[in-house]
UniProtKB/Swiss-Prot annotation:
It comes from Blochmanniella pennsylvanica (strain BPEN). It is found in: Cytoplasm. Its cofactor is Co(2+); Zn(2+); NAD(+). Pathway: Metabolic intermediate biosynthesis; chorismate biosynthesis; chorismate from D-erythrose 4-phosphate and phosphoenolpyruvate: step 2/7. The keyword Cytoplasm applies. Catalyzes the conversion of 3-deoxy-D-arabino-heptulosonate 7-phosphate (DAHP) to dehydroquinate (DHQ). It catalyses: 7-phospho-2-dehydro-3-deoxy-D-arabino-heptonate = 3-dehydroquinate + phosphate. Keywords: Amino-acid biosynthesis, Aromatic amino acid biosynthesis, Cobalt, Cytoplasm, Lyase, Metal-binding, NAD, Nucleotide-binding, Zinc. Binds 1 divalent metal cation per subunit. Can use either Co(2+) or Zn(2+). PANTHER family: 3-DEHYDROQUINATE SYNTHASE, 3-DEHYDROQUINATE SYNTHASE, CHLOROPLASTIC. This is 3-dehydroquinate synthase.
Length: 362
């Protein structure tokens, strides 16, 4: 078992990584007898894990309720959020209640946002069931919902009291879902750790066959990298922006397609290549590393081009609404020099971005 602490003074919390974490109630669960818990999950995860986790909690003396939501990024919405609030209010849950988000990034984001806003803030625990959520979405306190005009435009920073990462759940993922998580893993390496990128080049095949020691190391390394950034910049006002590599382009893809056709990881993978090509046009990155990135994404089963139906104009319409953009100026996180280094480039020329998107898609 691995334990990583997110260091945020009084709001510090543990990330626990191990297999078989749903078998026994272990002391690292930050719950006490008679705590009131509401398990929030979706209709894909519920048939596999809901009863297992709920029965574990009940056997341990935890008062446990449940709420099953529809699956899908398109359901990360105000309507679904209201469903959670209605459940909590009808059952008279008070501020001592603890929510547990059992699912992927969508469940984690919306459960966290419900916790951030219900009665001005209650506690919650993240139990991520996808690789993407385990290495990224469940960590760091970003919570929120989508709007038809943009992804994650409504949200709050609200840290969980724990993140419980059970490696066993990865065996139930499709290859598409697993590859989606690999996009965020590759992002960490490009942005922060060239040695980790080299490790991924050597061990990607081990990850694809779910080799447990490789998974443990990989997920732990991603959590360590993100923890180091969050400890410095919890609210995304400085260095945390490096974690947005590829996301301005990728969020444009998701928004344009209505959050239903491409997964988050697929969108980010294409977005990473667009960021790489933008950096090449700015003469701040090298072709050799660009080829390594493209090859690793391809080996991971991820797209290295955007959707055929999107034009560069479509991208720019959404990218100008990005949270990092100001007054229509495009502020983009781009690779610089070599793998392991990125920086925010401010007011990037729109025409250059359009050409970079075309470079990627041709």
């Amino acid at each position: 078992m691995e334990k990583i602490i997110i260091k945020l003074e009084k709001r510090s919390y543990p990330i626990i990584i191990a297999d078989k974490l749903f078998n026994d109630f272990l002391p690292f669960w930050p719950l006490n007898i008679d705590d009131k818990v509401v398990l929030i999950t979706n209709d894909r995860v519920a048939p596999i894990y809901l009863n297992i986790l709920r029965n574990l909690l009940i056997r341990s003396g935890i008062v446990t309720d449940q709420l099953i939501l529809p699956d899908g990024e398109q359901n990360k919405s105000l309507i679904t959020l209201d469903t959670i609030f209605t459940k909590l209010l009808k059952k008279n849950y008070d501020r001592s209640t603890i929510l547990i988000g059992l699912g992927g990034g969508v469940i984690g984001d919306i459960t966290g946002f419900a916790a951030a806003t219900y009665q001005r803030g209650i506690r919650f625990i993240q139990v991520p069931t996808t690789l993407l959520a385990q290495v990224d979405a469940s960590i760091g306190g970003k919570t929120g919902i989508n709007h038809i005009l943009g992804k994650n435009m409504i949200g709050a920073f609200h840290q969980p009291i724990a993140v419980i990462i059970n490696l066993d759940v990865l065996h139930t993922l499709s290859m598409k879902e697993f590859s989606s998580g690999l996009a965020e893993i590759i992002k960490y390496a490009i942005a922060l750790d060239s040695s980790f990128f080299g490790w991924l080049e050597s061990h990607l095949d081990d990850l694809l066959i779910l080799h447990l020691p490789s998974l443990m190391y990989c997920i732990r390394r991603c959590c360590e990298l993100k923890a180091s950034i969050i400890a410095i910049d919890e609210r995304d006002q400085g260095i945390r922006s490096v974690l947005n590599l590829g996301h301005t382009y990728g969020h444009a893809i998701e928004s344009y397609l209505g959050y239903s056709q491409w997964s988050h990881g697929e969108s980010i993978a294409a977005g990473i290549m667009m960021a790489v090509n933008t950096a090449l046009r700015l003469n701040q990155f090298n072709c050799s590393d660009a080829k390594r990135i493209k090859l690793l994404l391809t080996r991971a089963g991820l797209p290295v081009r955007g959707p055929k139906e999107m034009t560069s104009k479509n991208y720019l319409e959404y990218m100008k609404r990005d949270k990092k953009s100001i007054s229509g100026q495009l502020n983009l996180v781009l690779p610089t020099s070599t793998i392991g280094n990125v920086k925010t480039v401010f007011n990037v020329n729109h025409e250059l971005v359009s050409l970079s998107i075309e470079d990627t898609n041709n």
